[in-house]
Amino acid sequence: MVSVNENALPLVERMIERAELLNVEVQELENGTTVIDCGVEAAGGFEAGLLFSEVCMGGLATVELTEFEHDGLCLPAVQVTTDHPAVSTLAAQKAGWQVQVGDYFAMGSGPARALALKPKETYEEIDYEDDADVAILCLESSELPDEDVAEHVADECGVDPENLYLLVAPTASIVGSVQVSARVVETGLYKLLEVLEYDVTRVKYATGTAPIAPVADDDGEAMGRTNDCILYGGTVYLYVEGDDELPEVVEELPSEASEDYGKPFMKIFEEADYDFYKIDPGVFAPARVVVNDLSTGKTYTAGEINVDVLKESFGL
């Protein structure tokens, strides 16, 4: 079984070697942990965002720049492609670890989750485990972690602090915009497993595109814009060893199947009293899905791109 941590390490090493060209800053904490600043104090950039995203997916996907053009709205976009959908998205990329140490808080995603089993149920459902000696965690935060945070993460992962790598980017940064849009395939797999309770190991290949949100001036607004890029601008193509349930599952898969669909995410969040648990989890999904049943050769589609909500979200 491939290790998502060991597989992502060459990408991390490439980021360290090319730090100046990527506009990222590398520092070693006193306990030996390596921190790669991709947008807190460093500028970051598109290439750093693409690498950040590939690291987050355990090196089991390619993330490339493309273009989104729909009904007069033109934006840069990402194209995500993986031949290991369940592992790259749910075992690695999913933002399933709330890292809180003292006053520090970050959403943790990436390969290190597989060592810390955050959350354990996900790994049981997709039958995946990792036992690497190195841990790589991607943190969505506007603050850089210190030694206490690193010690906590290393301890949870069962690795020495000097074998821990922490990549950090705020939501309101170019790397933040890129890496959230690169979760377009992940949202499809997430909804299949967590909401529709479908066996995601049946998904054999996946690719998807989503526009990259204009960078906002604060993390709150950025959270809304980046989510909208997937909910209203994302398209995912899944290749599935299907069953009799698949046609009905596809109809429920896109974001439009949710009762919360149809308005910018920040409005949804506001109406939920800023409580994520009051939001219908079914809205966290791509706008449009195309599913090829490998067992029958049939193809099913559902959902559509909603440019009007994207424009409202971006203030256009």
Curated annotation (Swiss-Prot):
The keyword GTP-binding does not apply. Its EC number is 3.5.4.27. The keyword Cytoplasm applies. GO terms for molecular function: methenyltetrahydromethanopterin cyclohydrolase activity. Its main location: cytoplasm. It catalyses: 5,10-methenyl-5,6,7,8-tetrahydromethanopterin + H2O = N(5)-formyl-5,6,7,8-tetrahydromethanopterin + H(+). Signal peptide: none annotated. One of its GO terms (cellular component) is cytoplasm. Pathway: One-carbon metabolism; methanogenesis from CO(2); 5,10-methenyl-5,6,7,8-tetrahydromethanopterin from CO(2): step 3/3. GO terms for biological process: methanogenesis, from carbon dioxide; one-carbon metabolic process. InterPro entries: METHMP_CycHdrlase. It is found in: Cytoplasm. Keywords: Cytoplasm, Hydrolase, Methanogenesis, One-carbon metabolism. Catalyzes the reversible interconversion of 5-formyl-H(4)MPT to methenyl-H(4)MPT(+). Homotrimer. NCBIfam families: one_C_mch. Belongs to the MCH family. This is Methenyltetrahydromethanopterin cyclohydrolase. It comes from Methanopyrus kandleri (strain AV19 / DSM 6324 / JCM 9639 / NBRC 100938). The lineage of its organism: Archaea, Methanobacteriati, Methanobacteriota, Methanomada group, Methanopyri.
